[in-house]
Swiss-Prot record:
Phylogenetic lineage: Bacteria, Bacillati, Bacillota, Bacilli, Lactobacillales
Keywords recorded for this protein, A-Z: ATP-binding, Coenzyme A biosynthesis, Cytoplasm, Magnesium, Nucleotide-binding, Nucleotidyltransferase, Transferase
Binding sites annotated in the UniProt record for substrate: 11, 43, 76, 90
Family indicated by similarity: Belongs to the bacterial CoaD family.
Ribonucleoprotein keyword on record: no
Molecular-function annotations in GO: ATP binding; pantetheine-phosphate adenylyltransferase activity
Protein name as it appears in the record: Phosphopantetheine adenylyltransferase
């Protein structure tokens, strides 16, 4: 029997504790879980891709079956096929997230009907945490330590120094 391989994607700009929780839970469902950092042309970048990747790798270092990959100008289903993933993992905080994700699920299924999508609901303590909310707090100089993993906080501090 072949390994169960999943792919969880996002821009992770920055990664939050909500992302971390979904990844930790998803890692228990698969033999191998790829975490794909995707460039989102609809979002203005906050942290450079290299910083995001390094921060994620540190935050996820305790998960032996998880590997961080980065992608530019590729569809998620194409990356999934290339990596051998048969399942996309998505996190949901609310009904708006479900509606947003459902449209992508439709197209992904049209492009590759053998790739399934599973949704993991956010835990109550993470329902209102978002990367955009964290960026907004940072813009006004507020502390974000309770919203992001320590390694991400380090990357943000290092980027601010430069």
């Amino acid at each position: 029997m072949s390994d169960k391989i999943g792919l969880f994607t996002g821009s992770f700009d920055p990664m939050t504790n909500g992302h971390l929780d979904i990844i930790e839970r998803a890692s228990r469902l698969f033999d191998k879980l790829y975490v794909g950092i995707f460039f989102n042309p609809h979002k203005q970048g906050f942290l450079p891709l290299e910083n995001r990747k390094r921060g994620l790798e540190k935050a996820l270092g305790h998960l032996e079956n998880v590997e961080v990959v980065a992608s530019h100008d590729e569809l998620v289903v194409d990356v999934a096929k290339r990596l051998g993933a048969t399942c996309l993992v998505r996190g949901l905080r609310n009904a708006s997230d479900l509606q947003y994700e459902a449209s992508f699920d439709y197209y992904n299924h049209q492009l590759s009907s053998d790739i399934e999508t599973i949704y993991l609901h956010s835990r109550p303590e993470h329902l209102y945490i978002s990367s955009s909310g964290v960026r907004e707090l940072l813009k006004f100089g507020r502390d974000i330590a309770c919203y992001v993993p320590e390694s991400i906080l380090e990357e943000i501090r290092n980027e601010k120094k430069d």
